[in-house]
Amino acid sequence: MRTASISRRTAETDVSVSIDLDGTGKATIATGVGFLDHMLELFARHGLFDVTIKVEGDLHVDQHHTTEDAGIALGQAVAQALGDKRGIARYADIHLPMDETLSRIAIDISGRPFLVFRTSFRVEKIGQFDTELVREFFQAFAMNAGITLHVETLYGENAHHIAESIFKGLARSLRKAVAIDPREDGRVPSTKGSL
């Protein structure tokens, strides 16, 4: 089974994450940040990952540490669940529409963490959620999952739709990239023999 559980405690947050990469999309999310919960529920559902995330953070300060640390722990859980990455598809991409918005997400489960983030928001907040935290989440996730991640919104107006399109796009492309490719016959998908 490709599962993992991560616990991470700092002076700012206490985070626990579990993931099953071969799940059915069940989500139990409680970060204390409503919009982030919504995005993480979308991530689980569209990735068909079973995900549990609980965060107790310093929300009296702001939502930054909670959002970033959720991304760190989720990324670590994905990396751990992938193990040596034998048999995975490795690469995936998707164009994901959400009403007037279209975003493109591309992933390489390379072991070389990198983020290209070409998405912007016309407003500073979605409800009470700072839109700049969307990038912080993706940065934390990519660095800790050990993936190369390209996120680009080609066009869009509504900030909620833009955020939703890239979270769903991450889920759908990650779902394809972590899928077991029977033609790999259990090999690591790299000429180097390791990722």
Swiss-Prot record:
Keywords: Amino-acid biosynthesis, Cytoplasm, Histidine biosynthesis, Lyase. GO terms for biological process: L-histidine biosynthetic process. SUPFAM superfamilies: Ribosomal protein S5 domain 2-like (SSF54211). Its EC number is 4.2.1.19. CDD domains: IGPD (cd07914). It catalyses: D-erythro-1-(imidazol-4-yl)glycerol 3-phosphate = 3-(imidazol-4-yl)-2-oxopropyl phosphate + H2O. Gene3D superfamilies: Imidazole glycerol phosphate dehydratase, domain 1. It is found in: Cytoplasm. Pathway: Amino-acid biosynthesis; L-histidine biosynthesis; L-histidine from 5-phospho-alpha-D-ribose 1-diphosphate: step 6/9. GO terms for cellular component: cytoplasm. The keyword rRNA processing does not apply. It is an enzyme of class 4 (lyase). Belongs to the imidazoleglycerol-phosphate dehydratase family. HAMAP family: HisB. This is Imidazoleglycerol-phosphate dehydratase. It comes from Methylorubrum extorquens (strain PA1). The gene is hisB.
